[in-house]
Regions:
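Low-complexity, acidic/polar, glycine-enriched regions of mature
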Residues: 29-195
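Bacterial N-terminal signal peptides that target proteins for export
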Residues: 3-18
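N-terminal signal peptide c-region/cleavage motif recognized by signal peptidases
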Residues: 24-26
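C-terminal intrinsically disordered extensions
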Residues: 1-2, 156
Length: 195
């Protein structure tokens, strides 16, 4: 049978353990940010027939946990509705959504998850994350700035991807003389602290 002193010691350890776990959860919650969809943008620049064109996505979500003082606990998780692509050209949008490019019926969601961050100084950061597009996952680095003013912040940055690395371009669309392989991605996320 456990003695009274042993019982008290065990209870004390359990309480300390619970408090430590609670403190860890609170610390993580302090770095959580809520994206404001109406003020946030996710855009890209591509090239078709030698001319640049711009586009974006009307629907995407971003779960952001970011603290410049605790990069190890930071994480980005962005989910993109591929069918919401919008280049202000209906014919081009239909082509991008087709089976040879995004194939939105089979792959309705693209996802980017980053959990490795580097402080480059002067409010500039880089991250290495994994982009999944058309069921292909590859590392994609991003460069960004983070400006926090009283619990409201802007997260702005860029990335560069090669569309053919993700199978975006089947058949004639593999021809990079017609549609460039390099795509510049830009994002500007308006964030509000959730705690």
């Amino acid at each position: 049978m456990m003695s009274s002193k042993s019982s008290h010691r065990l209870a004390g350890r359990l309480v300390v353990g619970c408090l430590a776990s609670l403190a860890a959860v609170v610390a993580l919650a302090a770095a959580q940010w809520s994206m404001q969809p109406k003020e946030s943008k996710l855009t890209f620049v591509g090239e078709q027939a030698g001319a640049q064109f711009e586009g974006g996505f009307d629907k995407f979500t971003a779960d952001i946990a970011f603290d410049p003082k605790d990069l190890a606990a930071s994480r980005f998780d962005v989910k993109i509705d591929t069918a919401s692509v919008n280049t202000q050209d209906g014919e081009r949008d239909d082509a991008i959504k087709s089976a040879d490019l995004f194939d939105v019926k089979r792959f309705p969601t693209a996802r980017y998850v980053a959990d490795r961050f580097t402080d480059k100084g002067s409010n500039k950061y880089s991250a290495t994350g994994k982009l999944t597009l058309r069921n292909v996952t590859k590392d994609v680095p991003i460069d960004f700035t983070f400006e926090n003013k009283g619990g409201e912040a802007w997260l702005k940055g860029t990335a560069k991807i090669k569309r053919l690395d993700f199978g975006v371009g089947q058949g004639d669309w593999k021809d990079t003389s017609q549609v460039g392989n390099d795509v510049q991605v830009r994002f500007a996320l308006r964030l509000k602290g959730t705690s």
